[in-house]
């Protein structure tokens, strides 16, 4: 809890389901007080939920979260959700044969069936798209880009140093995210401590060739584009472990393409 800045405004407990001394399920119960205040609700969140294909297990996990929330004055339950939008969210309902990105949740097809039987209804849709990038940018798109840059006096900025981009724009990047993400489902703004953590966690490992900043006439940051290689295949090869060779697969996916 000391390491996770989200505990400045969140509280949580974690539960395991056992049968015959074997773990058959898990779930986190979370209250994001900041999000509840912003969205004027009293939601307890369930997150990081996993269970075997047994309704008794899934029901026990959800009921445990419900009771935990009721004891703390909550009136509704929602999930899967993490502490913030930077945690994995949602439940896969189609595309089970597709390889997802690292930041999304994969679950077996029986998961949403269990949720429906427990009385849950869909509250929001998240859609993941695959966009194919052309080998070369067309002249038309180049002309449009140049026209917009001239019209609004925009400047494109690229960096080659993670420390330099963190120093110059680390704070501003996450302030812009707070503003842009504000209307999104369940979003709660990042605190200063969270911003400091994310700047240290993410900016040093980004391939800066795939990071683009756009500033206006006053040198204010108005847009940021961050792309990252998928680590899904690397995590499969490493079996989710850094040793003995997991670190190599991850570094190769990040920087060697």
Regions found by a protein language model. Name each.
Residues 45, 155, 213:
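Conserved beta-strand positions that form and line the central face of beta-propeller blades
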Residues 105-186, 210, 223:
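Acyltransferase donor/substrate-recognition loop-hinge adjacent to the catalytic core
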Residues 11, 23, 40, 123, ...:
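A short, polar/charged loop/turn motif at coil->beta-strand junctions and beta-hairpin connectors
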Residues 37-119, 124, 238-257:
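Acyl-donor binding region in acyl/amide transferases
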Residues 6-8, 68-70, 118-121, 146-148, ...:
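A general structural signal for short secondary-structure junctions and capping/turn motifs
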Residues 1-21, 27-38, 158-257:
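A conserved beta-strand-loop-helix scaffold within acyl/acetyltransferase catalytic domains
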Residues 33, 83-87, 135, 231-233:
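Feature marks short, surface-exposed loop/turn motifs that line or immediately flank catalytic pockets
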């Amino acid at each position: 809890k000391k390491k996770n800045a989200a505990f400045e405004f969140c509280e949580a407990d974690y539960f395991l389901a056992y049968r015959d001394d074997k773990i058959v399920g898990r779930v986190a119960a979370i209250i994001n007080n900041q999000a509840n205040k912003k969205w004027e609700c009293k939601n307890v969140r369930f997150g990081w939920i996993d269970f075997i294909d047994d309704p008794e297990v899934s029901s026990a996990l959800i009921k445990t979260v419900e009771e935990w929330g009721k004891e703390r004055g909550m009136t509704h339950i929602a999930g899967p959700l993490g502490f913030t939008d930077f945690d994995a969210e949602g439940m896969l309902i189609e595309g089970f044969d597709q390889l997802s990105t690292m930041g999304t949740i994969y679950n077996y097809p029986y998961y949403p069936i269990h949720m429906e039987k427990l009385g849950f209804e869909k509250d929001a849709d998240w859609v993941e798209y695959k966009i194919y990038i052309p080998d070369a940018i067309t002249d038309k798109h180049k002309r449009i880009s140049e026209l917009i840059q001239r019209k609004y006096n925009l400047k494109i900025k690229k960096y080659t140093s993670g420390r330099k981009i963190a120093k110059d724009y680390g704070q501003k990047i996450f302030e812009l995210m707070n503003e842009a993400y504000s209307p999104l489902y369940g979003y709660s703004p990042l605190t200063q401590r969270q911003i400091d953590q994310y700047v240290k966690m993410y900016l040093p490992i980004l391939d800066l060739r795939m990071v683009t900043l756009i500033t206006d006439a006053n040198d204010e940051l108005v847009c940021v584009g961050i792309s990252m290689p998928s680590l899904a295949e690397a995590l499969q090869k490493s079996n989710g472990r850094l040793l003995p060779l997991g670190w190599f697969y991850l570094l190769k996916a990040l920087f060697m393409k």
